[in-house]
């Protein structure tokens, strides 16, 4: 079945990059992609500082290596997902199967919802570990990176919640079956039927057309007639 469904036009239609770039969902994915870089980038570059007791590096978030790893994995996952879903949005117009479109929208909805929750957990976790961090020369140097990761974790919550809402709206759009009516049902019930072909031996050149349903049924009761023997 080829037609408009789940917020996209008919399959095989020409791709318009200008209108695609102006879509709210596209802008949200780009913003979320930038936010993900702003989270894992500072942690990778400046998130590990020298400890006061030795040359080994420790995580700036209270020395908890799990906090740094969680922030990096969360940011990298969001980075890859934004790129993948952007490519899926580009190809979405070419998907002719309504079932495949539904699966793509459900995947977007499920992933966006899960990542919104993980961003909330990550924001709370990083904030808690930063509040417990003991001030020192290393933490003062990497303080800006830690605060940037926390701030953009919060912004990522908002952007991914917005993506979840947009995916839910697209899922609720579903499929408008009226768009396929002209393809499946033809031009209507009053379509004229062609007459007999020439040389078939049947006279008459007029075409037959089904009459409109305006006739009334004869509701008068007929009397009982005695059969003749």
Swiss-Prot record:
Q: Which gene encodes it?
A: Syngr3
Q: What is this protein called?
A: Synaptogyrin-3
- Subunit structure as annotated in this protein's UniProt entry: Interacts (via N-terminus) with SLC6A3 (via N-terminus). May interact with VMAT2.
Q: In which tissues is it expressed?
A: Specifically expressed in brain. Found in the brain across the dorsal and ventral corpus striatum as well as in the cortex.
Q: Which GO terms describe its biological process?
A: positive regulation of transporter activity; regulated exocytosis; regulation of synaptic vesicle priming
General function of this protein:
May play a role in regulated exocytosis. May indirectly regulate the activity of the plasma membrane dopamine transporter SLC6A3 and thereby regulate dopamine transport back from the synaptic cleft into the presynaptic terminal.
Kindly give the membrane topology term recorded for this protein: Multi-pass membrane protein
Question: What one GO molecular function would you report for this record?
Answer: SH2 domain binding
Which species does the entry assign this protein to?
A: Mus musculus (Mouse)
């Amino acid at each position: 079945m080829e037609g408009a469904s789940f917020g996209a036009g008919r399959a095989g239609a020409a791709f318009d990059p200008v209108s695609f770039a102006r879509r709210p969902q596209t802008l949200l994915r780009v913003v979320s992609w930038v936010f993900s870089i702003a989270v894992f980038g500072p942690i990778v570059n400046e998130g590990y500082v020298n400890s006061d007791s030795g040359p080994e590096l420790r995580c700036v978030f209270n020395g908890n290596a799990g906090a740094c790893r969680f922030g990096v994995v969360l940011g990298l996952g969001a980075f890859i997902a934004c790129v993948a879903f952007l490519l899926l949005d580009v190809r979405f117009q070419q998907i002719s199967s309504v079932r495949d479109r539904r699966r793509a929208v459900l995947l977007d909805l499920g992933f966006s919802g899960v990542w919104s929750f993980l961003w909330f957990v990550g924001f709370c976790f990083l904030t808690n570990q930063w509040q417990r961090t003991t001030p020192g020369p290393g933490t003062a140097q990497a303080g800006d990176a830690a605060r940037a990761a926390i701030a953009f974790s919060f912004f990522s919550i908002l952007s991914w919640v917005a993506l979840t809402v947009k995916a839910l709206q697209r899922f609720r759009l579903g499929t408008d079956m009226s768009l396929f009516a002209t393809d499946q049902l033809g031009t209507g019930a009053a379509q004229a039927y062609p007459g007999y072909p020439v040389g078939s031996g049947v006279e008459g050149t007029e075409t037959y057309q089904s009459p409109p349903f305006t006739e009334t049924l004869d509701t008068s009761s007929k009397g009982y007639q005695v059969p003749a023997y």
